[in-house]
Every structure is written in structure tokens, then in C-alpha cells.
Amino acid sequence: LYPVRFPWLNSTQETAVNKVLCTRDVAIVHGPPGTGKTTTLVEAIYETLHREPQVLVCAQSNTAVDWISEKLVDRGVPVLRIGNPTRVNDKMLSFTYERRFESHPAYPELWGIRKSIRETGSRMRKGSYSEREGMRSRMSRLRDRATELEIQINTDLFDSARVIAST
């Protein structure tokens, strides 16, 4: 099975990819700028995905995470980019957790429920005691449903991502 040949990589990169593929849980690739770490990591991640259902990719900078993520997306790998969207490059914005969460099919229902919770809370402050009791029950049901939807959306997002990328 090993070593795997990658004719498009130089010998150092090929050795690094094979070492990553031989590790059990965690692999760290480091080195000076311009030495091919991104290319090496993308290949190692891509090959790992033939053996594992999901890979967590972490790097010290958002730029590095975005470079790796972009190259994986270009290869058709489903990536979920975690992190502050203001620090993510434009090409990767549609792959951020926040954007994917808001574009999930269940999000409109969740948004509507959150709106109802706000409106009900506002009415509760103005209502009589008996009205507030009924509204409390409604709020409880709304919150329970919102939690169910949030869990569903998160499960879908994380289960469908082959790569989860973050700083």
C-alpha cells in the first residue's frame, strides 16, 4: 500500500504525503514559505479522504486555511469553513458555516420561529398575568422547535462536509 507515488510532486513532497498517510490520527506539516506545504497538504488530505470519512484541517492563518480549502473545493471536496467570515477570502465565503447555515432548507422555518419568539417576548412584557402564562407555554414550544432545527441544521452541515477547515 505504501509508499504511494505522486509523479506531480517532488520527492520531498511525496515523502511528506506518505508520512501523513501513515500517521494514525494527527499529522503536522511545517516549513518555510514557498516550500510546497499547501500542495503537499492538499494531496495528503485528498488521499486521506479515500480512507477516512472526514478530515479536520487547521492552520495558523486564515490565508493558509483558505488556500488549502480553495484547492480542495476546486477538486470537488465538500468543505465547511469555520471562522470569522470577515477574515475569510471572498471565494470561500459561500463555504463558511454562517453562509451554509443560512442557506440550509430548514433555515427559513428557524428564522420565522426566532421572529415569533421575539414578538411573543415583546407581547409578554405588556400582557396580563393570565396572558403571560399562555405565552410562556408558547415560548417554550417555540424554543424547543428552534433547538431541534438548530441541531438538525448543524448535523446536516457537519455530516455533509468531508473537510472541516479552521484556524
Functional labels for PLM-detected ranges:
Residues 40, 44, 64:
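Hydrophobic positions on the alpha1 helix immediately C-terminal to the Walker A/P-loop
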Residues 49:
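Conserved ATPase "switch" residues in P-loop NTPase domains
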